[in-house]
Amino acid sequence: MNITIPKLVIAILLLLIPALILYRLDRRFLRMASIVIARLTITLIVLTACLYYVFLWDKTWVNILWVLLTSGIATSVYCKRRWQKIPIYISMTVVTFVFGILVLLLIDASHLFSAPFFIPVMTMLQAEALFVCRRGITTYVLERRQHPELMEYLKGNGASKIEALRPFLTKAITRAFTPALSLLLLVGLVFMPSLLCGLLMGGFSPLQSVAFLAIMTSVALCSTMLTLVFTIYIYTRIS
């Protein structure tokens, strides 16, 4: 793949087409979209510069530090409430690290902590866990605040604390994973996952690409479920 500056400029100029359409239809939305694209551009420039040196150095401690920093920044930006950030960051970092190493072992990576393998795998696992966990812990907290009498009723009828929390945990898991499972139903039927497209464009065979996608999907579902459970556990302990 050989993408030159002129080719990149041509691709960016294509944004003028939707911009002209929005200019005629909704200028307020155009301003909002322009701000989002400008922020995205700045983020990509900074990210590219950082990743260039991270991949250039390719040292174990640098790669681990990069994953810890990016996951912390992503958690702070995506999770608006303070009570979401600490439980999600701790559980996500620990669980995805363990399962990320498992993925690297399963795909027989030449070096577990090399940047081309370690950083993409950890990033994909943490992104999925972050989206699901924020939705899950928000549901859990809101359900407990809206129905405090249910927990007291269950405890009054002899249920332990864990048993009394079970309805709230069930609701959190159900709501958190429903969108993810719905998306999986469309894979292969309506669209091809971007990960699979990237592997095919990178020269991997269809068999190896699908095998890696299957491994990542299985591990992501498992690690995300455990991350959500540990997130709720940590929140319950510190709240």
Give residue ranges: language-model regions.
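Loop-to-helix transition at the N-terminal end of transmembrane alpha-helices
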Residues: 28-67
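C-terminal ends of transmembrane helices
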Residues: 19-31, 73-84
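Non-cytoplasmic
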Residues: 182-207, 227
